[in-house]
Amino acid sequence: MIPVRCFTCGKVISPAWEEYKARREKGEDPKKILDDLGITRYCCRRMLLTHKEIIDELNPYQ
């Protein structure tokens, strides 16, 4: 679950997550993906670059 907004500046970033993830899995360069998606602020870039999906690992503990 990607946060809806950047923690630092508040820009909405969640719509870019699915495309970023799909293109990253294909082996594309993260810099190029983020540039293409229009994510220019380094705080927003950090949100996508450092996010790790752990929701599937946490589901058994509900």
Swiss-Prot record:
The keyword Ribonucleoprotein does not apply. It catalyses: RNA(n) + a ribonucleoside 5'-triphosphate = RNA(n+1) + diphosphate. It is an enzyme of class 2 (transferase). GO terms for molecular function: DNA binding; DNA-directed RNA polymerase activity; zinc ion binding. Zn(2+) binds at residues 6, 9, 43-44. Keywords: Cytoplasm, DNA-directed RNA polymerase, Metal-binding, Nucleotidyltransferase, Transcription, Transferase, Zinc. Pfam families: RNA_pol_N. PROSITE patterns: RNA_POL_N_8KD. DNA-dependent RNA polymerase (RNAP) catalyzes the transcription of DNA into RNA using the four ribonucleoside triphosphates as substrates. Part of the RNA polymerase complex. This is DNA-directed RNA polymerase subunit Rpo10. It comes from Methanoregula boonei (strain DSM 21154 / JCM 14090 / 6A8). The gene is rpo10.
